[in-house]
Amino acid sequence: MVVIKQCLGYIIKPFVHIFNVSFQSGIFPDQMKRAKIKPLFKNGDKQNMQNYRPISVLSVFSKILEKLMYNRLLSFLKQHHILTETQHGVRENKSTETASQSFIESVQEALDSQRKVIGIFLDLSKAYDVINHETLLNKLDTYGVRGITNNWFRSYLTRRS
């Protein structure tokens, strides 16, 4: 990262061009889809492979391109009022802590009003690993993310290694 910062003046124009071509063509470059898989120790016996989980390490340039699209998508979702105030993920000043606080306040308010409260909790760990890509792309289309931008997401999701 330090090297990239030091060379930024020399490399920024070519990368801006690559990023713009990616957005305009609806193609996420295959070279930026390559990740290095590294084992991350969780806990317990370091000799037991079950105590590790794989993590994907992407290139800095891939992360920059992803962040640029994230900002574009978030702007679109805000502009078209697609995200509700109760949406805590991927929102500024929102987190698991604010979601928990909102939940606790809702439960307390219901109990104070003598209403019944039912909680259903789901463990969605590894949800990104199992989501059906066609369903996701169709949902984006439903929300107005169509054409070249939807193609970009399709390209992003395919041929990853």
Residue ranges, per PLM feature:
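Conserved pre-catalytic core of RNA-dependent polymerases
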Residues: 1-161
